[in-house]
UniProtKB/Swiss-Prot annotation:
The protein's assembly and partners: The Tol-Pal system is composed of five core proteins: the inner membrane proteins TolA, TolQ and TolR, the periplasmic protein TolB and the outer membrane protein Pal. They form a network linking the inner and outer membranes and the peptidoglycan layer.
Any one GO BP annotation for this protein: cell division
Protein name: Peptidoglycan-associated lipoprotein
Keyword Lipoprotein: yes
Boundaries of every OmpA-like domain copy: 60-176
Primary subcellular site in the record, as a coarse category: membrane
Listed GO CC annotations: cell outer membrane
The organism of origin for this protein: Legionella pneumophila
């Protein structure tokens, strides 16, 4: 009976991964991630009514901070200093919006084992989360996940593609 449950769970997870892998990001013709300094709004913010933990009708801004994507060097979990002002802007946003929640997702390129890459992605996300905590953001506002190499931003197999996949993403979580 347990084997059947694990089999069903495996099928469910495989289906979810397949659906996620086949979907395209809106506005991206090649499925690649766009890296830029423009204003970025949190996903789904236009359709939501409030952040988790925030009362409906309580005011909030729909403009998330700049640079919700941070790239890393190969096999490294050290955040480049050029990203610190942007991470600090994220921290200020979270401190002034205590109802806001953010998921920090760590990613790697395709090189290396699954286990190693999940651990590396987690170290990358933890690095950014620790900067937020040191800046005064509540632990309850931060959730860290690692996808390792399972959710590439770019499906290419060259160094430029690998560089886009070695990243941490901020994903603001909202409730309806």
């Amino acid at each position: 009976m347990k084997a059947g449950s694990f089999y069903k769970l495996g099928l469910l997870v495989a289906s979810a991964v397949l659906v996620a892998a086949c979907s395209k990001t809106p506005g991206s013709a090649d499925g690649g991630a766009a890296v830029g300094d423009g204003d970025a709004t949190a996903q789904g913010l236009g359709q939501m009514t409030h952040f988790a933990g925030q009362e409906p009708g309580e005011s909030y801004t729909t403009q998330a901070p700049h640079n919700q994507l941070y790239l890393f060097a190969y096999d490294d979990s050290t955040l480049a200093s050029k990203y610190l002002p942007s991470v600090n802007a994220q921290a200020e946003y979270l401190k002034t919006h205590p109802g806001a929640r953010v998921m920090i997702a760590g990613h790697t390129d395709e090189r290396g084992s699954r286990e190693y890459n999940v651990a590396l992605g987690e170290r990358r996300a933890d690095t950014v989360a620790e900067i937020l905590r040191m800046a005064g953001v509540s632990r309850q506002q931060i959730r860290v996940v690692s996808y390792g190499k399972e959710r590439p931003a770019n499906y290419g197999h060259d160094e430029a593609s690998h560089a886009q996949n070695r990243r941490v993403e901020f994903i603001y979580e909202a409730t309806r």
